[in-house]
């Protein structure tokens, strides 16, 4: 690692990348990020010069509106199971016929 990348480091640590491209996050990093195994997610940003910024994906980065909507749907399904119906795939295909959609594209804030 270049010396200038460590100039502001409080602690440095390393981990090895496995043949499958995986690594174990060292304990000091997990502790600093307050990561809970099996619960938390990590956000990565690739910076100029090949450096990567990594942080815990926290509540402040969650979509509170979407979460509220999903809680509403969950409660509605729980309280009114008689109103749930199977999805008709043919009707769904008709709804999107002629649309050019790439499900891998990110949805921007203006959409």
From Swiss-Prot:
<keyword id="KW-0238">DNA-binding</keyword>
<dbReference type="Pfam" id="PF15937">
    <property type="entry name" value="PrlF_antitoxin"/>
</dbReference>
<dbReference type="GO" id="GO:0044010">
    <property type="term" value="P:single-species biofilm formation"/>
</dbReference>
<dbReference type="GO" id="GO:0003700">
    <property type="term" value="F:DNA-binding transcription factor activity"/>
</dbReference>
<keyword id="KW-0963">Cytoplasm</keyword>
<comment type="function">
    <text>Antitoxin component of a type II toxin-antitoxin (TA) system. Labile antitoxin that binds to the YhaV toxin and neutralizes its ribonuclease activity. Also acts as a transcription factor. The YhaV/PrlF complex binds the prlF-yhaV operon, probably negatively regulating its expression.</text>
</comment>
<comment type="function">
    <text>Negatively regulates its own expression as well as relieving the export block imposed by high-level synthesis of the LamB-LacZ hybrid protein. Overexpression leads to increased doubling time and also suppresses a htrA (degP) null phenotype.</text>
</comment>
<dbReference type="GO" id="GO:0006355">
    <property type="term" value="P:regulation of DNA-templated transcription"/>
</dbReference>
<dbReference type="InterPro" id="IPR031848">
    <property type="entry name" value="PrlF_antitoxin"/>
</dbReference>
<dbReference type="GO" id="GO:0001558">
    <property type="term" value="P:regulation of cell growth"/>
</dbReference>
<comment type="subunit">
    <text>Homodimer; forms a complex with YhaV with stoichiometry PrlF(2)-YhaV(4), possibly as a YhaV(2)-PrlF(2)-YhaV(2) complex like the MazFE complex. This complex is seen to dimerize in solution.</text>
</comment>
<protein>
    <recommendedName>
        <fullName>Antitoxin PrlF</fullName>
    </recommendedName>
</protein>
<dbReference type="GO" id="GO:0045892">
    <property type="term" value="P:negative regulation of DNA-templated transcription"/>
</dbReference>
<dbReference type="GO" id="GO:0042802">
    <property type="term" value="F:identical protein binding"/>
</dbReference>
<dbReference type="GO" id="GO:0097351">
    <property type="term" value="F:toxin sequestering activity"/>
</dbReference>
<dbReference type="GO" id="GO:0019899">
    <property type="term" value="F:enzyme binding"/>
</dbReference>
<dbReference type="InterPro" id="IPR007159">
    <property type="entry name" value="SpoVT-AbrB_dom"/>
</dbReference>
<dbReference type="GO" id="GO:0003677">
    <property type="term" value="F:DNA binding"/>
</dbReference>
<dbReference type="GO" id="GO:0005737">
    <property type="term" value="C:cytoplasm"/>
</dbReference>
<dbReference type="InterPro" id="IPR037914">
    <property type="entry name" value="SpoVT-AbrB_sf"/>
</dbReference>
<keyword id="KW-0678">Repressor</keyword>
<feature type="domain" description="SpoVT-AbrB">
    <location>
        <begin position="12"/>
        <end position="59"/>
    </location>
</feature>
<keyword id="KW-0804">Transcription</keyword>
<dbReference type="GO" id="GO:0110001">
    <property type="term" value="C:toxin-antitoxin complex"/>
</dbReference>
<keyword id="KW-0805">Transcription regulation</keyword>
<dbReference type="GO" id="GO:0040008">
    <property type="term" value="P:regulation of growth"/>
</dbReference>
<keyword id="KW-1277">Toxin-antitoxin system</keyword>
